[in-house]
Amino acid sequence: MIIHEITEECFKKYGKVIDSIDLTELVSTMQTVEIPADVVYEPSISALEKLKCATELQQKTYGELPIQIGWCIGNNHKLNAVEYHRCSEVNIAATDAILILGRQQDISVENTYDTSLMEAFRIPSGTAVELYATTLHYAPCNASAGGVLVAVVLPKGTNEALEHPHTGGEDALLAAKNKWLIGHPEGGLPDGSYIGLTGENLEIK
């Protein structure tokens, strides 16, 4: 799979680089974390949310909406699923990371999606990117054997457990609050996950 750089023109349809906020303290805090063998996502990490940059992210990037800052860390090499939100997601890399990205507009009316439409991008350590609401994404992949550390910023409450049943149409994709998910048959997702990815379960080697 070709690995593009976020400076390339093809990235612009998925998101943009955030360079107006000093994220040095957040990156250095992340780099003290021990990288687990498997990929782990935590939606809210208080040590990150207390940092000065959290206020700037809330005020500048999310228009003063309450936010949560968590992380996705560990080792990951495969796509396994795609998700999208009704808002942008900010990823802040504390190691080099690879994001596999697609577009919500390419989901079929049957709520399937062909993984051959996706592109991969390298996010250099110390870099923050805003992924637009229509950008399909999932857990970042390793850019090296040492694992991956990425902070994840979203509106507060995103990825919390649902309070009501959801079935039929796009509603069937809702896996958690503000999280619509389409899984791959080989993705190893929990029972009940919506499976609709066709094509290869993309892998970064």
For the regions a protein language model found, what residue spans apply to each?
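Aromatic-residue-lined binding/catalytic grooves and analogous aromatic/hydrophobic interfacial grooves
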Residues: 131
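Active-site region of the double-stranded beta-helix
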Residues: 1-125, 138-205
